């Protein structure tokens, strides 16, 4: 027996409102599209769903009620102008990271950088976006998660930029240092959530990989370790790093304690919060 699409969407919308009131209708559309293996626009070309399709939707709704992020359920996430495959164990890209992309694009255009390192590649959203944007760059991307590297490789192949991105397993810059990889620009959206923030995180966020979120007791552990390594490197390179507004001033103080002479620029997100810093060693 078939069930009217409109009725199913309204039912899903009402249920999802209890979890995510701001985007309930959008989530309902995306879940239906996922079950049909079509895009959102397609669902409005049909009038009915089968009982089997509705049963699948009920199971997906149960997962949402348990706090499983929508993007893990439908296995995709739109970021910038690309669609990425995502799965459990890999950080879901956020819109805030698009600020980092804009800063990186502007920097690459102005400085003509060709050799770029990304620390913590995740789903590949940053490296792939930049690789699609610039024809003549080479990106060396690393992560401490084998799952993330697997997903990033898949997404790079999907977007036909595998030849521009080389993936490494490892922490910070060590995989590149051990291979004598030369680079001009470092990009990273590192873990920066402090211990005190964890109790206040949304249930969905807590389902994402802890290693991709936790930045130590004060959220600054990654930055300290990176700056310790960079202090040994010398000059003539740039780093573009995403930060939490809560640790902005702490990171600046850490930088000033580590380095006597660096140029620091900061960039705000769409809500006016400090979200990205650019550090130039010259």
Curated annotation (Swiss-Prot):
Family annotation (Pfam families): MTS, PrmC_N
Annotated TM spans: none
Gene Ontology biological process terms, A to Z: methylation; translational termination
Listed EC numbers: 2.1.1.297
Residues binding substrate, per UniProt: 189-192
Binding site for S-adenosyl-L-methionine: 120-124, 143, 189
Gene Ontology molecular function, alphabetical: nucleic acid binding; protein-(glutamine-N5) methyltransferase activity; protein-glutamine N-methyltransferase activity
Entry keyword set: Methyltransferase, S-adenosyl-L-methionine, Transferase
Recorded catalytic activity of this chain's protein: L-glutaminyl-[peptide chain release factor] + S-adenosyl-L-methionine = N(5)-methyl-L-glutaminyl-[peptide chain release factor] + S-adenosyl-L-homocysteine + H(+)
InterPro entries: Bcl2-like, DNA_methylase_N6_adenine_CS, HemK-like, N5-glutamine_MTase, PrmC_N, RF_methyltr_PrmC, SAM-dependent_MTases_sf, Small_mtfrase_dom
The UniProt record lists the keyword RNA-binding: no
Enzyme class: transferase
Task of the protein: Methylates the class 1 translation termination release factors RF1/PrfA and RF2/PrfB on the glutamine residue of the universally conserved GGQ motif.
HAMAP family: RF_methyltr_PrmC
Stated family: Belongs to the protein N5-glutamine methyltransferase family. PrmC subfamily.
Name of this protein: Release factor glutamine methyltransferase
Origin species: Dictyoglomus turgidum (strain DSM 6724 / Z-1310)
């Amino acid at each position: 027996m078939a069930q009217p699409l409109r009725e199913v969407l309204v039912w899903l919308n009402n249920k999802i409102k209890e979890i995510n009131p701001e985007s309930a209708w959008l989530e309902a559309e995306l879940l239906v599209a996922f079950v049909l293996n079509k895009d959102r626009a397609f669902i409005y070309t049909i009038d009915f769903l089968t009982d089997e399709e509705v049963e699948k939707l009920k199971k997906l709704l149960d997962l949402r009620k348990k706090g499983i992020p929508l993007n893990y359920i439908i296995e995709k996430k739109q970021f910038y102008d690309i669609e990425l495959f995502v799965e459990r164990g890999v950080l879901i890209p956020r819109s805030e990271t698009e600020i980092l992309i804009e800063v990186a694009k502007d920097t690459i255009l102005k400085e003509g950088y060709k050799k770029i390192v990304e620390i913590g590649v995740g789903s590949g959203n940053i490296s792939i976006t930049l690789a699609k944007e610039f024809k003549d760059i080479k990106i060396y991307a690393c992560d401490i998660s084998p799952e993330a590297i697997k997903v990033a490789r898949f997404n790079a192949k999907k977007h036909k930029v595998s030849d521009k991105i080389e993936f490494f397993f490892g922490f910070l810059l060590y995989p590149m240092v051990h291979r004598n990889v030369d680079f001009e620009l470092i990009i990273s959206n590192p873990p920066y959530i402090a211990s005190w923030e964890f109790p206040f995180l949304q249930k969905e966020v807590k389902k994402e990989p802890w290693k991709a979120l936790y930045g130590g007791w004060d959220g600054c552990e990654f930055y300290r370790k990176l700056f310790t390594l960079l202090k040994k490197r010398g000059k003539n390179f740039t780093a573009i790093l995403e930060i939490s507004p809560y640790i902005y001033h702490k990171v600046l103080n850490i930088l000033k304690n580590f380095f006597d002479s660096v140029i620091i620029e900061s960039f705000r997100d769409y809500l006016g919060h400090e979200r990205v810093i650019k550090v130039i060693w010259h």
